Curated annotation (Swiss-Prot):
It is found in: Cytoplasm. GO terms for biological process: chaperone cofactor-dependent protein refolding. NCBIfam families: PRK00364.1-2, PRK00364.2-2, PRK00364.2-4, PRK00364.2-5. InterPro entries: Chaperonin_GroES, Chaperonin_GroES_sf, Chaprnonin_Cpn10_CS, GroES-like_sf. This is Co-chaperonin GroES. HAMAP family: CH10. One of its GO terms (molecular function) is ATP binding. The keyword Glycoprotein does not apply. GO terms for cellular component: cytoplasm. Keywords: Chaperone, Cytoplasm. Together with the chaperonin GroEL, plays an essential role in assisting protein folding. The GroEL-GroES system forms a nano-cage that allows encapsulation of the non-native substrate proteins and provides a physical environment optimized to promote and accelerate protein folding. GroES binds to the apical surface of the GroEL ring, thereby capping the opening of the GroEL channel. Belongs to the GroES chaperonin family.
């Protein structure tokens, strides 16, 4: 199944959780922090401005992005957990 977000929404696959600390300690599943980075899988057509024009989104499919820990809504599609969030919930794009 494919999902197409509407307007200024973006679908993001969250980066895998870290299961080890930098010091090598293995974390149990409930202790691992959810990463606040991910990959953009789909984008909406853009924000509808007051004059009716559509402003395209600044992010595109494939971008690696940083967002707030509690940003977006989690949905499960074909057994995979994805986030649907507004473009304004994204803090920046990781380049390089």
């Amino acid at each position: 199944m494919k999902i197409r977000p509407l307007h200024e929404r973006v679908v993001v696959r969250r980066k895998e959780e870290e299961t080890k600390t930098a010091g090598g300690i293995v974390l149990p599943g409930n202790a691992a922090e959810k990463p606040s980075q991910g990959e953009v899988l789909a984008v909406g057509e853009g924000r509808i401005l007051d004059n009716g024009d559509v402003r395209p989104l600044a992010v595109k499919v494939g971008d690696k992005v940083v967002f707030g820990q509690y940003a977006g809504s989690t949905v499960k599609i074909d057994g995979e957990e994805l986030l649907i969030m507004s473009e304004s919930d994204i803090f920046g794009v990781i380049e390089g």
